[in-house]
C-alpha cells in the first residue's frame, strides 16, 4: 500500500526523516511544502506551532503539519526553550556549554509539538524527553543540540543514534506516534 | 498646552518614562493600553513591532505605539538580538557575561523600533546606539541590560544615567525623536 502524503512546512531534512520513520507505521509520509512559516513569538511552543500551521493551511488550502521543538535547560531557567533554533544559530552548542561551565545540574528536556491544520481545525500533538546535557559534544548524526543531549535510559547522545533508535527516546518520535494514533482513528485529514 | 495622548502597548514603566521624556518636546505623551501584544517570531525587530502594532490597532481601534528593542552582541553573532527580553528573563546578565568571559571583542549595539499603527497604516521609527559590554554590572537605573551597556562617547553604563542623559545616547531616545519629527510633520495620528 502506498503511503498517503501530508505536507509539512519545513525544509529541515532531519525532521522530515525522523517523522517519516514513525509515520510509515501508520501508512503516511510527510513531504515539504513551500509555505512561508509565520511564527508568533510566544513562550509556548504549542502556540507557535498551531498558529504557524493555521497560516500555512490558509496559504496552501491543504492539510499541513508544522513541527516546532525546543530544548529546556533546568539550570538556565528553561533557556533556550522556544528560541532554541535562533540560539543555536548564534551562540551554538559552544555557547550553551559555556553557560553550563561549573554548573552541577545538567538536567534538561526536549519538547516537540506537531500541529496539524486541516479543514476541521488544528490538532496539536506533543512529546517530551528528559535527559542531561553532556560535558562535550559527541556524535555526528541528527541536528541542533543532538550532540550534547543524553536521554534518560541511554548513555549515548542523540547524535550517536540512528534515526530509529533516536525516535524510541525522542520528543519528536513521541509526538509523531501521537499523530499516528490520531490518523488511525480519524483517517486522512482534509 | 496639555500634551496629546497616544496609547502604547506595554506595561514597562521604564520604556514609558523614557519615551515620554522625549515626546514632551513635541507636545505628546504615551499611556499604557490594555492590549495583548501578539509578537511574531522574526529576526527583524521591525517586523515584530509593526505586526504587533497593527494587531493592537485592530483590537483598540485607536492609534497605538509598540516599542521593541534588542541588544546585539558582535562576538555572539548578534545574540540575544530580537529575543533579548526572553534571554534576560532566563539566563540574565549573568549568563550574558559568562558567554563573554575571555572574549576580547565586547562590541555591541542596542536597537529600538517604534511602530505607530493608525488609520493610515503603520509607521516605523528606529534608533541604534553602538557601545561595549562592561566587564561587570554597574548602576541601578533603567532596566534589562542597562547595567552592562556603555555607549560610545560615555564611560558610564546606561544604568548609571538619569533618563535624560540616557536618552541623549540611547536607541530608544533616537527612535522617539524620529517619532516626534513625524508627529510635528503630520499632526496627531487618527
From Swiss-Prot, chains A, B:
User: An example Gene Ontology cellular component term from the record?
Assistant: cytoplasm
Share an example GO biological-process annotation for this protein. Answer: nucleotide metabolic process
- Required co-factors: Mg(2+)
Residues the entry annotates as binding substrate:
10-15, 69, 143-146, 166, 171-172
For this protein, the Enzyme Commission number is 3.6.1.66
**Binding positions for Mg(2+) per the UniProt entry:** 39, 68
Instruction: Identify a single GO molecular function assigned to this protein.
Output: dITP diphosphatase activity
**Catalytic reaction annotation:** XTP + H2O = XMP + diphosphate + H(+); dITP + H2O = dIMP + diphosphate + H(+); ITP + H2O = IMP + diphosphate + H(+)
| Record function comment | Pyrophosphatase that catalyzes the hydrolysis of nucleoside triphosphates to their monophosphate derivatives, with a high preference for the non-canonical purine nucleotides XTP (xanthosine triphosphate), dITP (deoxyinosine triphosphate) and ITP. Seems to function as a house-cleaning enzyme that removes non-canonical purine nucleotides from the nucleotide pool, thus preventing their incorporation into DNA/RNA and avoiding chromosomal lesions.
Q: Sorted alphabetically, which PANTHER family does this protein's record hold?
A: INOSINE TRIPHOSPHATE PYROPHOSPHATASE, INOSINE TRIPHOSPHATE PYROPHOSPHATASE/HAM1 PROTEIN
What is the protein named? dITP/XTP pyrophosphatase
The organism's lineage is: Archaea, Thermoproteota, Thermoprotei, Desulfurococcales, Pyrodictiaceae
Amino acid at each position: 500500500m502506498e503511503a498517503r502524503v501530508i505536507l509539512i512546512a519545513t525544509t529541515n531534512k532531519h525532521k522530515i526523516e525522523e517523522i517519516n520513520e514513525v509515520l510509515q507505521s501508520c501508512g503516511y509520509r510527510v513531504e515539504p511544502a513551500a509555505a512561508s512559516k509565520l511564527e508568533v513569538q510566544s513562550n509556548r511552543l504549542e502556540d507557535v506551532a498551531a498558529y504557524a500551521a493555521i497560516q500555512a493551511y490558509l496559504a496552501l488550502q491543504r492539510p499541513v503539519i508544522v513541527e516546532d521543538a525546543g530544548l529546556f535547560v533546568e539550570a538556565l531557567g528553561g533557556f533556550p526553550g522556544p528560541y532554541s533554533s535562533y540560539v543555536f544559530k548564534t551562540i551554538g552548542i559552544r555557547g550553551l556549554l559555556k553557560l553550563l561551565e561549573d554548573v552541577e545540574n545538567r538536567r534538561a528536556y526536549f519538547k516537540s509539538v506537531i500541529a496539524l491544520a486541516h479543514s476541521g481545525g488544528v490538532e496539536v500533538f506533543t512529546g517530551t524527553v528528559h535527559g542531561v546535557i553532556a560535558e562535550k559534544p559527541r556524535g555526528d548524526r541528527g541536528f541542533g543540540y543532538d550532540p550534547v543531549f543524553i536521554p534518560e535510559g541511554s548513555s549515548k547522545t542523540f547524535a550517536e543514534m540512528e534515526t530509529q533508535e533516536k525516535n524510541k527516546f525522542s520528543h519528536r518520535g513521541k509526538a509523531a506516534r501521537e499523530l499516528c494514533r490520531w490518523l488511525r482513528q480519524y483517517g486522512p485529514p482534509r
